[in-house]
Amino acid sequence: MAGQPGHMPHGGSSNNLCHTLGPVHPPDPQRHPNTLSFRCSLADFQIEKKIGRGQFSEVYKATCLLDRKTVALKKVQIFEMMDAKARQDCVKEIGLLKQLNHPNIIKYLDSFIEDNELNIVLELADAGDLSQMIKYFKKQKRLIPERTVWKYFVQLCSAVEHMHSRRVMHRDIKPANVFITATGVVKLGDLGLGRFFSSETTAAHSLVGTPYYMSPERIHENGYNFKSDIWSLGCLLYEMAALQSPFYGDKMNLFSLCQKIEQCDYPPLPGEHYSEKLRELVSMCICPDPHQRPDIGYVHQVAKQMHIWMSST
């Protein structure tokens, strides 16, 4: 879900939505062998409008009739796109995501299966996202001030550190998944489920099938790990400064892109506009060897120091 059709912002209040008020529906084990806890049903929501869609999902702005909260309701055709094992893993992952509680993370409020669809109830953030902000500055032919870069990046790091501390990887950090509220609060969305809904959120697609944020270990199919999230954070920090992905190219094919990623071949950030600390952190995160990348604790600490320093100057 990003700030474009098929990827939408989510945000809003998350207090006890449907968790105690919702009707309990007995599961049908034959029809829904991997049913999540039935806390809500579609009858509990008034759908207002569609705000996003993917190949196997649609997202709606909706009102929960039980407490009048405005939410995002994502409907996923789970039985068409997954086998039984993938459904089980997806259900388990959603259970973990519901336990996350952080001011900079889109809250997973509830989930249930109805009419052969997985319905995920999410906090709704109805402002913009980081990709839209980057496009705006690019159109204006202006760089994002470094103070602003750290203001948002430190909040993003706080969100990722919360996830990693609970052994949850994001797997799809990119500007379109970083929502910004009207008051300047970052909300990280599309948590951890990208591999299940692969047709719509596998990687950062600026061109169809072009994964600009894919780490070297993923190119080599060595699996995703916590340091892969760090690579993506480095790419995002670079993009906030340069207004484009470090590995972007106008006429690249997938092979040449993968070569650039493996060799960490990207243009340096302008030293006259951005601090050595920012450029150094980008270099540490966009490192081909995942073992050489810092952990999220270090990245967050640097971001906090720079945010405080920039705010005081």
Curated annotation (Swiss-Prot):
Ubiquitous, with highest expression in heart and skeletal muscle. ATP binds at I51, G52, R53, G54, Q55, F56, S57, E58, V59, K74. It is an enzyme of class 2 (transferase). Changing Y108A: Increase in catalytic activity. Induction: Up-regulated during the M phase of cell cycle progression. Down-regulated in both replicative and premature senescence of cancer cells. Belongs to the protein kinase superfamily. NEK Ser/Thr protein kinase family. NIMA subfamily. Interacts with STAT3 and RPS6KB1. Interacts with NEK9, predominantly in mitosis. Interacts with KIF11 (via C-terminus). Interacts with APBB1 (via WW domain). Interacts with ANKRA2, ATF4, ARHGAP33, CDC42, CIR1, PRAM1, PTN, PRDX3, PIN1, RAD26L, RBBP6, RPS7 and TRIP4. Pfam families: Pkinase. Displays an autoinhibited conformation: Tyr-108 side chain points into the active site, interacts with the activation loop, and blocks the alphaC helix. The autoinhibitory conformation is released upon binding with NEK9. This is Serine/threonine-protein kinase Nek6. One of its GO terms (biological process) is spindle assembly.
